[in-house]
Amino acid sequence: MSPRPQIKVGVLGATGTVGQRFIELLAAHPYFALHALGASSRSAGQQYARVVRWKLPSPIPDAVRHMVVHECRPDAPGFAECGVVFSGLDADVAGDIENAFRAADLVVYSNAKNYRRDPLCPLIVPLVNPSHLSIIPYQREQLGLKKGYIVTNANCSTTGIVVPLAALEKAFGPLDTVIVTTLQAISGAGYPGVSSLDIMDNVVPLISGEEDKIEWETNKILGGVTPDNKAFDLHAPKQINVSATCTRVPVIDGHTGCVSVKFARSPPPSVAEVENAFREYTCDAQHLGVPSAPAQAIVVHDAPDRPQPRLDKNLHNGACVSVGRIRECPVFDIKFVCLIDNVRLGAATSSIINAEIAVEKGLIQ
């Protein structure tokens, strides 16, 4: 069997923290070949290594070191030949730029929040709901496009929470109520991020806009697509009641969530049944065998003091969710602690796995 031809890809926001992670993950990817880099007008026309303030522990990949950076425009050199464009743009500029690329009939897989609530755009956590890609033909039809569309991945904390919630709904039916408190790493604020005087020896009990994202996104992700593949049902007929409190803690990478769950069914499952549901959970990314999918979607920790960001965030190359401290909840039914690598599965890795799945489904060529 002949090897799969690589698909040319571009990265928008290539010099930023998410863009750097995209480049690291794509530099030696079996499906994709880096072909175009986009950044601000200040960086345009220069070699990537000259304009980027590289913040990852690995070196700048040789494949991109001497690539010329262009402005984030669909008519800039290289982008028209790309089968997919990955966006690591900040939300304050992502909306118009991503829409321009889609309007130019290009495929965009975005880490930004701008189109997560769009009724035509899938909001996909690759370990949960790639079935939502079925709305893409309708998105194209509504916008008069042949190839172009936008897919977004979720907020980084939402991603870590909905994977275990999806396992619970798959095994035991609908959830009624979820309360979560997050302890979010400083890397989630980007670079330079939170002032050291604000975060050292401290916990900041507010991340602006974060709680609303978790509360809203959960139902779009865990819901389905209508039978005609033209809308998202947002977990109809009964949405999950979700209440989130989000805090920033002095951890570099790794978002932790403390989750309490009430099931719609009565009696609820036992702790042992919940633990088994987490261990047995598998997802479409694994079944399709895409290269960035984790061997385990959920890693269950038996030690009473795990998961911990320092020890567990890198499991399965940061592409899984860790779960531990599964126990009965005296207020609801079950409570547990979950952990996600916010800079990988919580960001660039999700977009890449989403695109890998789309390749297997014939939605990227």
Swiss-Prot record:
It comes from the Eukaryota. Pathway: Amino-acid biosynthesis; L-methionine biosynthesis via de novo pathway; L-homoserine from L-aspartate: step 2/3; Amino-acid biosynthesis; L-threonine biosynthesis; L-threonine from L-aspartate: step 2/5. Its EC number is 1.2.1.11. Inhibited by the competitive inhibitor 1,4-benzoquinone and derivates such as 2-chloro-3-methoxy-1,4-naphthoquinone, 2,3-dichloro-1,4-naphthoquinone, 2-chloro-1,4-naphthoquinone, 2-bromo-1,4-naphthoquinone and 2,3-dichloro-5,8-dihydroxy-1,4-naphthoquinone. SUPFAM superfamilies: Glyceraldehyde-3-phosphate dehydrogenase-like, C-terminal domain, NAD(P)-binding Rossmann-fold domains. GO terms for cellular component: cytosol; nucleus. It catalyses: L-aspartate 4-semialdehyde + phosphate + NADP(+) = 4-phospho-L-aspartate + NADPH + H(+). The keyword Amino-acid biosynthesis applies. NCBIfam families: asd_EA, PRK08664.1. Catalyzes the NADPH-dependent formation of L-aspartate 4-semialdehyde (L-ASA) by the reductive dephosphorylation of 4-phospho-L-aspartate. Mediates the second step in the biosynthesis of amino acids that derive from aspartate (the aspartate family of amino acids), including methioinine and threonine, the latter of which is a precursor to isoleucine. PANTHER family: ASPARTATE-SEMIALDEHYDE DEHYDROGENASE. Homotetramer; dimer of dimers. This is Aspartate-semialdehyde dehydrogenase. It comes from Cryptococcus neoformans var. neoformans serotype D (strain JEC21 / ATCC MYA-565). The lineage of its organism: Eukaryota, Fungi, Dikarya, Basidiomycota, Agaricomycotina.
